[in-house]
């Protein structure tokens, strides 16, 4: 099989690494308020598959969309961009 097509990627910070092969990643984005034209920080947390348990809390990571791995996991770890330590 060839390339699976374009998959969405996100960049975020690991906030929890207490599960086996799973980390929680917070992805922040800026949204402009329609009336006041002020930018507001919004964030969403994703459960991300980490096969090697290599992430620690505070790491900056890149994640990629994948097939559903469990009830909540639809993202996988692509790479660690910055280590917290």
UniProtKB/Swiss-Prot annotation:
SUPFAM superfamilies on file: Nucleic acid-binding proteins
Keyword Hydrolase: no
Any one Gene Ontology cellular component term annotated for this protein: cytosolic small ribosomal subunit
A single MF term (Gene Ontology): structural constituent of ribosome
Gene3D superfamilies named in the record: Nucleic acid-binding proteins
Alphabetized UniProt keyword annotations: Ribonucleoprotein, Ribosomal protein, RNA-binding, rRNA-binding
GO biological process: translation
UniProt cross-references to InterPro entries, sorted A to Z: NA-bd_OB-fold, Ribosomal_uS17, Ribosomal_uS17_bact/chlr, Ribosomal_uS17_CS
Known partners and oligomeric status: Part of the 30S ribosomal subunit.
Family recorded in the similarity comment: Belongs to the universal ribosomal protein uS17 family.
Function per UniProt: One of the primary rRNA binding proteins, it binds specifically to the 5'-end of 16S ribosomal RNA.
The protein's name: Small ribosomal subunit protein uS17
Organism: Trichlorobacter lovleyi (strain ATCC BAA-1151 / DSM 17278 / SZ) (Geobacter lovleyi)
């Amino acid at each position: 099989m060839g390339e699976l097509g374009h998959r969405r990627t996100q960049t975020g910070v690991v906030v929890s690494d207490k599960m086996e092969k799973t980390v929680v990643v917070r992805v922040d984005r800026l949204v402009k308020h329609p009336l006041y034209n002020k930018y507001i920080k919004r964030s969403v947390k994703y459960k991300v598959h980490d096969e090697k348990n290599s992430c620690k809390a505070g790491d900056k990571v890149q994640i990629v969309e994948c097939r559903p791995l469990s009830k909540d996991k639809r993202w996988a770890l692509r790479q660690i961009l910055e280590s917290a330590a």
